[in-house]
Amino acid sequence: LTHSFPTRRSSDLLHTWSLALEVHYYVLWALLAWFLAKRAKTVGQYRGMLFFASSGLFLFTFLSMFIRAFLTANFSTIYFSSFTHIFPFFAGSCLATVTGIANVSPNFTKLVQSWSMKKTLSVLGGSFAFLFVLSLFLPFDSLWTYLFGFLAATIAACAMILSARILHEKTPDKKEPAILNFLADTSYGVYLFHWPFFIIFSQHLGNMM
């Protein structure tokens, strides 16, 4: 897509290249999960293999971002690199092995029982508030964003996912509000297309945008 514009304008669409990160993860992680499934003898063993593989890849890729942050003045090379920016996905993989969906672990069942509704909602709301504060004080051109910001945001996001998962288990007879289902179905599509469309139309409409 960027090659359809002059070279001097290619940076305008650089934002869309970050989406390739998800494609890389979905393809490579699926292959690794398939490889481990062929060698696991039980569901529990498979879950453990996935957890340790996810943990190892998480630490390796995060440390790659951490170290490279000291070695470059252009943080875009870190942010748009799949190798250094992929670690939050592996954190999510670790969390998925703990919570499960169709096959829930006994430890997660105990965790659901030990959390009150108040605690669940507090963690969910507190994590969201923490992410909002991070967005105000850690810009993308700050060294601290790459040393600690992305890690802190990943931990907060995992806390939100965990609390939402527990909330789901605690409210089996409750239906999600229709507005939340609508946002869940459309938000990613809007994110995927808003930036290239904005750039393309702004070239033709100028200030009318």
Which residues make up each language-model segment?
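Alpha-helical transmembrane segments
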Residues: 53-61, 124-129
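Conserved beta-strand->loop/alpha-helix structural units within folded catalytic cores of enzymes
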Residues: 19-34, 91
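Single conserved hydrophobic/aromatic residue that forms the stacking wall/gate
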Residues: 1-7
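Individual transmembrane alpha-helix segments
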Residues: 9-21
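Alpha-helical transmembrane segments in multi-pass integral membrane proteins
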Residues: 8-9, 35-44, 66-209
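A membrane-interface helix-boundary motif in multi-pass transporters
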Residues: 46-50
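Transmembrane alpha-helical core residues of multi-pass small-molecule transporters
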Residues: 25, 32-33, 57-60, 149
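Membrane-embedded glycan transfer/ligation machinery
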Residues: 3, 14, 25-29, 88-89, ...
